[in-house]
Every structure is written in structure tokens, then in C-alpha cells.
Amino acid sequence: MASKVRKVTSRQKKNVKEKDTVKIEETEFDPSLLPLPASSTKQATQRLYRELRLIVHKQDTPSNDLGFYVKLDQLHSIYQWVVQLKNFDPSIPLAQDMARHNVESIELEVRFAPDYPNLPPYIRVLRPRLLRFMNGGGGHVTAGGSVCMELLTLGNSHDRGWYPEYTMEAVLLQVKLALSSLNPPARLDYDWKRDYNAREAMDGYIRSANLHGWVIPPHWTTLFKR
């Protein structure tokens, strides 16, 4: 995996904190109607309701281009999202690969533990398959498709890692920024049509986090390996 994604500045940290004062207009989408997993908690559920409603409100506003889209038709739990990253800078190699193969977006799965927001979200690429780091690829995506960067871990004695104040909008933008990095650039794999699976994604996350000495959140291997 490439070097760490650039740190969030103090000004950016202020911008990624929850914006409870934002007025959300009523829409047909009501996240409270979604079923909850047995391990859900009140704290995580309320935070996720708020986060998701803010994102849906913005993505339903034509003037807003978030650069990503939460697929509501595939949202079967507030604790598990499918997100499309789109509208990459057309000059970067990843965007050029995508255009060449008529790939419209990078599709992610985002999963949340019952300890969220005290623990970070777990994010992995579903499709398309990206070129491995050992073969010249980049973008902070492991060989198994998981996104592994300091922001999505508990850090270590030198790196702070996750902050509970981070919003999911800011996190997804950071993931897109990492995929847009040119050092080295993310590229589509030769076998790009083959989807990643959950087991290889978690195995890749563990290997990469251990390599950097980052602390893996507890219970992730049992929660997200399937």
C-alpha cells in the first residue's frame, strides 16, 4: 500500500464535524424504517440516521455534486451502505481506465460497528477490481479490496487515526481523494470485471494495518469478514 493519505488540517477538522444546525427538508426517504441488526446501539443508530439524512438531502439537490452517491435501492440496513464514487478528474489514470472500459463509478460497501462513531466505518471496494500495489497500483486499496488508511483505523502511538467527530461525507471524500492520488495512481486491474469478496477484503485490511502498526478496531474480523 502507498504512503498515508494527507492529514486533515485543523480547519478541515472543523468542517468535518457534525452540522446539527443544518435544516433537512422532509423527503420520502425515512431511514428509521430500515431494519436494525441485532447488535445495533442507540448511539450508533441515531448518529447514522442523522448522517444519512444529511447526505441524501444533499445528493437529492441538483446543484450539489458530492462526487459520490449512496444507493438507496440497495440500502437494507442503516449499518450497511452501498456507495458509488463518481466524477473523478478525467486527467487521472483511474478515470481514463474507467472511461476506456465504460465503468461509470467505483462501488463501495460501507459498514458500521455498533460502537460507531467511537470506531471508524469499515470500507471496501466491491467493484471494479483495482491493480494491486505490488503490480504498480495505488489508491490505498489493499489486494483484497478494502480501503486501509490511517483515518479508518485506531492509529498507533504516532498516528491518531479515527476521530468520532468525522462525518461520513468527509470520510467518503477522503477515500475518493486517496483513490485520486498519483503516488502511485490507482488503476483498473487486468481482471477488473471480477468482484472482490468480503473475506479477501478483511484479510487485506488486517495485513496492511499490521504492516503500518495501526490498531484494528475490536471485533471487526467477526463482524465484517462475511
Predicted regions and their residues:
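UBC/E2-like fold recognition across ubiquitin and ubiquitin-like conjugation systems
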Residues: M1-E104, D115-R226
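Extended lipid/amphipathic-ligand handling interfaces
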Residues: L108
